[in-house]
UniProtKB/Swiss-Prot annotation:
Domain of life: Bacteria
Gene Ontology terms: cellular component: small ribosomal subunit
Protein name (Swiss-Prot/TrEMBL): Small ribosomal subunit protein uS5
Source species of the chain: Lactobacillus helveticus (strain DPC 4571)
Family: Belongs to the universal ribosomal protein uS5 family.
Subunit-level organization: Part of the 30S ribosomal subunit. Contacts proteins S4 and S8.
UniProt note: domains: The N-terminal domain interacts with the head of the 30S subunit; the C-terminal domain interacts with the body and contacts protein S4. The interaction surface between S4 and S5 is involved in control of translational fidelity.
InterPro entries given in the database record: Ribosomal_Su5_D2-typ_SF (IPR020568), Ribosomal_uS5 (IPR000851), Ribosomal_uS5_bac-type (IPR005712), Ribosomal_uS5_C (IPR005324), Ribosomal_uS5_N (IPR013810), Ribosomal_uS5_N_CS (IPR018192), Ribsml_uS5_D2-typ_fold_subgr (IPR014721)
UniProt-listed GO biological process terms: translation
Length: 168
């Protein structure tokens, strides 16, 4: 049963970018004639080789909301620097009142993270990391804070280049 569920939530496209559903919310708009139901989907996309992004989509049907979220996620992909199977250094990502602390871990230790952070790390291809979620725990805030933390990562070469003034 786990395999069937994985294949449903994790699809592979021809451009080698996978997507994984994080959350689906039912949204209700109250109008004169009653309630109008819509769905909002949060999807994380990535190639498991250092590129990751997230997207949101809203529609009257769940599959259409997921499709819109995947398109949105592909537009907003970022490159994540990696050192082997982990991240180069410790970092804190912020979004709203949600904070995510990401720490590098030794090879083979795995991803010690909650649901939404684990999905982002899996889609980015990071297999060894430790994280702590602080503040808001809603999936959208956690995903945005995690992506913010990944944007802040720098390799040692990038840091050295910034520290060294160019010589004329």
């Amino acid at each position: 049963m786990a395999n069937r569920n994985d294949s449903r939530n994790n699809r592979r496209n021809k451009d080698d970018i996978e997507d994984q559903l994080v959350a689906v919310n039912r949204i209700t708009k109250v109008v004169k004639g009653g309630r109008r139901m819509r769905f909002a989907a949060l999807v994380v996309v990535g190639d498991k080789k250092g590129r990751v992004g997230f997207g949101t989509g809203k529609a009257q049907e769940v599959p259409e909301a997921i499709r819109k979220a995947v398109e949105d996620g592909k537009k907003k992909m970022i490159n994540v620097p990696k050192v082997g199977t982990t991240i180069p250094h410790e970092v804190i990502g912020h979004y709203g009142s949600g904070n995510i602390l990401l720490k590098p871990a030794e090879a083979g230790s795995g991803v010690a993270a909650g649901g939404a952070v684990r999905i982002v790390m899996d889609m980015a291809g990071i297999s060894d990391v430790t994280s702590k979620s602080l503040g808001s725990n809603t999936p959208i805030n956690v995903v945005r804070a995690t992506i913010d933390g990944l944007k802040k990562l720098r390799t040692s070469e990038e840091v050295n280049k910034l520290r060294q003034p160019e010589r004329a």
